[in-house]
């Protein structure tokens, strides 16, 4: 008689078997390629309650069991002011997936209401600082975030459109404000559509963006509101639907190449104000062909860059 698996065991098996190629392999490859984990590391896995961070937490658990590198983990949930329903869903999902979370309260959502123009930026910076601080108090030397392939591309395009610069999200970096602390992104090479497929395969229901400001804006019915990241995500989705030749992988490969060279040259890039690697003007022009392809600008004749 076959053994009945617990929900957590079924979820783990789906990662290691059904989604081994799109999830587990790029997860392990990214950690090895960027040397994210070293023996003796004490890593705070930061959980927001969304699909990305919950998958990250489960894969970090699995990695501890299947790797020869000894390291410790803490599963840190920072509650910035979630409503009761979202908080309870995080607790329920963590119990279902057998992830031993530790929840810490803050009032970040209330504090960021004062920033009328850029509340998302202020919120992100405050959340990052809180996570670094709490992780350090817990004896951790690293925090792990659930950013993935799509986040890397979207951040680059968002910087081009709204920051007038080509910049990239790094797979790992040092913190300037918290000496001895590092940030790693183990899901750097994983595609969001594969995360969604895994979630649906297991019939899991995670919270989306639980920001109070976002909830209020979405009542207007446009589904996007003033979120610049949501606008870029929709833009790239539309481009892929209307022009299958839109090449996000090509842009990611260029980011990967620049990031790898920077990490090798300086061992690891420092945490900047935007927590990203900034390219020089010369590099921007060198990659501008990819930019044209990505945003699908129709021109009467090809540009001659000499």
Question: Over which residues does each language-model region extend?
Answer:
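Cationic, amphipathic, low-complexity alpha-helical segments enriched
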Residues: 255-258, 265, 281, 291
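An accessory alpha-helical subdomain
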Residues: 231-259
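ATP-dependent adenylation/nucleotidyltransferase module used to activate substrates
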Residues: 2-158, 162, 166, 170, ...
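Disulfide-bonded cysteines in secreted/extracellular proteins and peptides
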Residues: 120-123, 140, 211, 263, ...
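Charged/polar low-complexity intrinsically disordered segments
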Residues: 264-268, 283, 287, 301-304
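Catalytic subdomain that performs nucleotidyl-dependent activation
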Residues: 72, 151-235
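Intrinsic-disorder-associated, low-complexity terminal segments enriched in Asp/Asn/His/Tyr and depleted
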Residues: 266, 271, 275-278, 296, ...
